[in-house]
Amino acid sequence: MHPYLDLMRHVLQYGHKKTDRTGTGTLSIFGYQMRFDLQQGFPLVTTKQCHVKSIIHELLWFLRGDTNIDYLKKNGISIWNEWADKSGELGPVYGHQWRSWTVSGDKSIDQIAQVIQQIKATPDSRRMIISAWNVGDLDKMALAPCHVLFQFYVVDGKLSCQLYQRSADIFLGVPFNIASYSLLTLMIAQCCNLKPGEFIHTFGDAHLYLNHLEQARLQLTREPKSLPIMELNPAIRNILDFRYEDFTLHNYDPHPPIKAPVAV
């Protein structure tokens, strides 16, 4: 996971102090890219422990098209609690946009189903894109999408994914984002009879919150360990059939967790 540590190091050295929506303040850069070869292991940060259960359940929650945190709470996941209303609703966030982007009236588009069909039928297409940035729905969302658009690319029997993330909390959020979209790439590749290729992570505003700087410096003192392997149940060929029990992470031996406050 050297690319992730290099990003953190770059922001600590070259980041600009900026104010932000939360009032916390950040060190920020604009424009950066990381690449991960998914054939070399599953890109899960090893210089601190990541909560893999949260990553898997959140992704399954997105893929369900769900926007209520009830499913997450039932599975012991609290990462969206701060933004939900009293009934657990978040508005038309990621799951809604991925699975039922509203066109007009009762019509909607299932972008996940559409892109999988494109990968299978027209793998050389340059239109294999999913967007969560629905301008007409932004004011209804509890939190505007941070990871806004991703595109797939097929070559030599391998599926790659590139994510554009407009806003990135490097210390807390980015390890989740890397793992989540890498896992989604593995899942879709399996459903399309392809091998995983690369995950490419492109950023707009990538930042370290000012109350995360000490934690970031601590993390940079730790030596990365070998990447784990994520095994998927090979019998699953439909993206909506995956369940938590269909994922097994092998050889994950991270350094201890590092706690940091969430900026809301």
Swiss-Prot record:
It catalyses: dUMP + (6R)-5,10-methylene-5,6,7,8-tetrahydrofolate = 7,8-dihydrofolate + dTMP. Its main location: cytoplasm. InterPro entries: Thymidate_synth/dCMP_Mease (IPR045097), Thymidate_synth/dCMP_Mease_dom (IPR023451), Thymidate_synth/dCMP_Mease_sf (IPR036926), Thymidylate_synthase (IPR000398), Thymidylate_synthase_AS (IPR020940). Signal peptide: none annotated. It is found in: Cytoplasm. It comes from the Bacteria. Keywords: Cytoplasm, Methyltransferase, Nucleotide biosynthesis, Transferase. (6R)-5,10-methylene-5,6,7,8-tetrahydrofolate binds at H51, D169, A263. GO terms for molecular function: thymidylate synthase activity. GO terms for cellular component: cytosol. Homodimer. HAMAP family: Thymidy_synth_bact. This is Thymidylate synthase. It comes from Nitrosomonas eutropha (strain DSM 101675 / C91 / Nm57).
